[in-house]
Design a protein with these regions (language model features):
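A metal-dependent hydrolase metal-coordination microenvironment
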Residues: 1-79, 84-87, 91-94, 100-118, ...
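C-terminal functional module detector
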Residues: 130-327
Length: 327
């Protein structure tokens, strides 16, 4: 099945809503730094946002508001664009499910590996972020393939939450038809024969050889690179809580698989449980931020009062001096 999600800013588009493959979605964010989110399976629009550059807790508040609907899927859009999300933010933020890894404007690998290294179960999507549906060159390059039978949006979202998907980057071929791109994507569905984790050993099997397979570990470190192969096995080290795989095809197509976690039970946790488990590890505190703001206001008021008293003393001195000279 093919799912088309037409996202607009702060509006859930209802075009084709009677179709089985309709996905309610909208893009959130009208701020200067493009700190945007994509809400897939949205039932309502969260209108609140912070227009000026956001603090970590501004960002966390917005994500928490979106995550109150436990059936939706929250994606951090193009985090590398305008540093809408700083890489270090991803060590601490919770209540989201995916990162938009592939985008025409920026790719956010450092953000993804930072979140994974911090112990967050975060998956990825590819997105054309196209604002002109009549430009075939800009459609179908960055996509998300979902594996398994998903005949409606609810099942699709469920599979995405389980990481049963892959982000795809098709090479740029000028004037390539949409049908040609569709054919390539359909063929990719059968490429991955199986991925397993047995006795701390990652195994991947493909239906045909690819130009290159890379295995990535903590902090985005390259653990293994092999060329012209159709299968490999790789052991988890004591320092790796996750491993992820990248596939490079001869025609330039790139596939970014979602991570495999050493602890399968942890890999199956939902965003709310993950937030509960890790929130105590956060090095920041909303109360401290409020205290800091209050302190700044207090200092500002104190400075104004000092200046006011100083001006009054100067004014009093001028009056006294004038009075004496007149005397």
């Amino acid at each position: 099945h093919t799912f088309h999600a037409l996202s607009q800013y702060h509006k859930i588009d209802t075009f084709n809503k009677e179709k089985q493959n309709y996905v309610p979605v909208y893009e959130h964010g009208y701020n200067l730094k493009k700190t945007h989110q994509l809400v897939i399976g949205a039932k309502r629009v969260v209108w609140k946002d912070y227009i000026f550059p956001q603090t970590l807790h501004n960002k966390q508040f917005i994500l928490h508001e979106m995550a109150k609907d436990t059936n939706n899927l929250v994606v951090l859009n193009h985090p590398a664009v305008r540093s809408g999300y700083d890489v270090n933010d991803l060590k601490l933020l919770h209540y989201y499910d995916h990162i938009e890894l592939l985008n025409p404007s920026a790719q956010s690998f450092a953000h993804w590996d930072t979140a994974l290294t911090a112990g967050k179960k975060i998956f990825v999507v590819g997105n054309d972020d196209n604002h002109n549906i009549f430009n075939d060159n800009a459609i179908g390059r960055f996509t998300t393939l979902i594996f398994g039978a998903a005949s409606d949006s609810k099942k699709m979202i469920d599979r995405m939450k389980k990481g049963q998907s892959v982000a795809v980057w098709l090479p740029q071929i000028h004037n390539e038809t949409l049908e040609s791109k569709r054919s390539k994507l359909l063929n990719l569905h059968s490429l991955i024969s199986g991925i397993s984790l047995i006795d701390s050993m990652l195994a991947i099997n493909l239906s045909k050889s690819v130009a290159e397979i890379r295995v990535i570990g903590h902090h985005g470190k390259l653990k293994l690179k092999q060329r012209n192969i159709s299968s490999l096995t790789f052991p988890f080290s004591q320092n790796d809580a996750y491993l992820r795989v990248e596939l490079y095809l001869e025609d330039g197509t790139k596939l970014y698989l979602n991570p495999i976690f050493r602890d399968i039970a942890e890999g199956n946790q939902g965003r709310n449980l993950i937030a509960t488990n890790y929130i105590s590890r956060d090095r920041t505190n909303p109360l401290m931020e409020s205290f800091a703001l209050a302190s700044m206001i207090g200092i500002f008021v104190s400075v104004r009062n000092v200046k006011k008293r100083k001006n009054m003393r100067i004014k009093d001195m001028n009056i006294d001096t004038t009075g004496m000279s007149l005397g």
